[in-house]
Regions:
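TPR-repeat structural position
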Residues: 188, 230, 383-384
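Membrane-proximal, proline-rich intrinsically disordered regions
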Residues: 19-66, 288-293, 298-301, 311-314, ...
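Short, surface-exposed recognition loops and adjoining beta-strand edges that mediate ligand/DNA contacts
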Residues: 33-34, 61-78, 153-162, 204, ...
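Conserved, well-structured interaction surfaces
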Residues: 82-152, 182-183, 200-204, 355-362, ...
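Bacterial Sec-dependent N-terminal signal peptides
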Residues: 3, 9, 15-41, 191, ...
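Extended ligand-binding clefts on enzyme/binding-domain cores
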Residues: 228, 234-238, 242-355, 360, ...
Length: 486
């Protein structure tokens, strides 16, 4: 796409022309990846810059996480007009959050590719100590492609990956090039190739705020699940679980875990800092806050739906991260707690140990999710093992009977996934992979919040289940394929 190439080329030119020397005018802990890599130290600074860019509001810092939950039916809205375009599926090619996904995603791919190219050039010259950083960059490149293809392409298992995905970009792109959308299968093949190449290079040591071998395996496992390769996915997940490198939170410390950074379950989380990635009044925490609680601009945007609350047990410890909404007040029953405070640390705005309670890290991969995905995979061949994995998480409700090989099923795993991962940006993507219908609690409060863009119940055949390509992209390259319906 010409638009992509123009964006990528301008980023390179501006970054290079604005810097007299590598670290002359940039922070010492991060830099734009289009500057030259001359040492291992340079490569690390470049990776820092890439990780920081991925925490922007148009990616993991807010919108990508919102997308995965507001479209999944376990959240509803109090009233219309407050950041609700994703909930309504009001996507349009002329503008909106999907434009930010596209631009930021390809910006990050540019940086990842420049890091990879620079490191590989140094390795050819004989520089050592670069394997881990190369493995990190390859893993992140795979993750970005994975995110983009899920936003703009149909699920792999919907048609075997035959439909249009996104342009695979694995090298700096010349401004005259016009890369077209590759088939979903080709995108997934590249993702698997990057993750497989990275696995023997990347360190198994924990590195807070960065990907390691276990993050690589978790991403690989999820990718394989999208390809219906459950045996390979289970192998990847078992590599994590059996290593015992991470441990599940006990029921007693699950709630408090949200007040800490890089806990025992955290396989990969983006670090958010008050002076760098903190979005303040525009943060995820404020989006999920009760009205005017976390900030005077908090409108009580998104609340847990009755559908989610109905699958929660009365004594489930996960109620501890929820609190009352602005309509009912604190005297309401505990099972009316609608507001999720994971991104504020606690209902008392504890944060996660920084000077501002809105600069809370984004937990991308937790061990709890790995257990639940492993349970789904094991269910295909070993129900007893699947029950063991599921029980490790479901015991967070002390009243829930243990699952057995005779009682476990796909819905049991799916509903536990919903309980555990509310507001973590996962649900809608999983629903599309599993070919599930999504029902929305529209008009929950009687204030006319029914969507004009979708029905009350949708599935993955609905054209708005994937995003449109932006009109600027279409105008710059008329040959690019627009998703049907837009």
């Amino acid at each position: 796409m010409k638009k992509i190439t123009i964006i990528l080329s301008l980023i390179c030119v501006l970054a290079i022309s604005s810097c007299e020397g590598f670290l002359d005018v940039t922070p010492t802990n991060q830099a734009d990846s289009s500057t030259s890599i001359t040492s291992a130290a340079d490569a690390q600074v470049m990776i820092n810059g890439l990780m920081n860019k991925m925490t922007s509001s148009s990616y993991y810092g807010r919108n990508f996480v919102l997308y995965g939950d507001t479209k999944g039916g376990d959240l509803t809205i109090y009233t219309a007009g407050f950041d609700d375009n994703m909930y309504y599926f009001a996507h349009r090619a002329e503008g909106g959050s999907q434009i930010g996904f596209w631009i930021t995603g390809y910006d990050c791919l540019l940086q990842a590719n420049n890091i990879i190219q620079g490191i590989e050039a140094l390795k050819e010259e004989g520089t050592t100590g670069l394997d881990d950083m190369l493995g990190q960059a390859l893993t992140i490149r795979a993750l970005i492609h994975f995110d983009l293809v899920r936003l703009y392409g149909k699920p792999y298992n919907m048609d075997g990956g035959a439909s249009h995905g996104i342009p695979v970009v694995t090298a700096p792109v010349d401004a005259s090039a016009k890369p077209q959308r590759d088939p979903v299968k080709k995108v997934y093949d590249q993702i698997v190739a990057d993750l497989t190449k990275a696995a023997p290079l990347i360190s198994k040591s924990k590195s807070n705020g960065y990907v390691n071998y276990y993050a690589n395996q978790a991403i690989l496992g999820k990718v394989y699940m999208y390809m219906d390769n459950f045996s390979s996915a289970l192998t990847a997940f078992k590599n994590i679980i059996d290593s015992k490198a991470y441990t599940l939170y006990t029921p007693a410390n699950w709630v408090a875990s949200w007040k800490s950074q890089f806990g025992s379950e955290s396989i990969f989380e983006f670090a958010m800092y008050p002076n760098e990635g903190d979005l303040g009044a525009s943060s995820l925490g404020v989006r999920y806050s009760r009205r005017e609680h976390a900030h005077n601009s908090a409108y009580g945007y998104f609340l847990a739906s009755t559908y989610w609350k109905n699958i929660m047990g009365k004594n489930d410890i996960r109620w501890g991260i929820m609190t009352f909404d602005h309509m009912r007040g604190q005297e309401a029953r505990s099972d009316w707690d609608d507001c999720c405070y994971k991104y504020l640390g606690s209902p008392t705005l504890a944060g996660d140990g920084k000077s501002t309670y809105t600069a809370v890290n984004i937990k991308v991969i937790r061990l709890s999710e790995v257990y639940l995905l492993a349970a789904e995979c094991a269910l295909k061949s070993d129900k007893a093992t699947a029950a063991t994995y599921l029980n490790a998480i479901s015991k967070r409700d002390p009243d829930r009977p243990a699952w057995t090989a005779a009682t476990i099923n796909e819905d049991a795993v799916y509903n536990e996934y919903r309980r555990e991962l509310l507001t973590e940006g996962k649900l809608f993507f999983e629903q599309m992979r599993q070919n599930r219908k999504v029902t929305f609690e529209d008009d929950a409060w009687g204030f006319g919040t029914t969507s004009q863009y979708r029905d009350k119940t949708v599935d993955r055949t609905f054209f708005r289940a994937i995003l449109p390509i932006g009109i600027d992209e279409i105008n710059s390259n008329p040959d690019i394929y627009q998703n049907p319906g837009y």
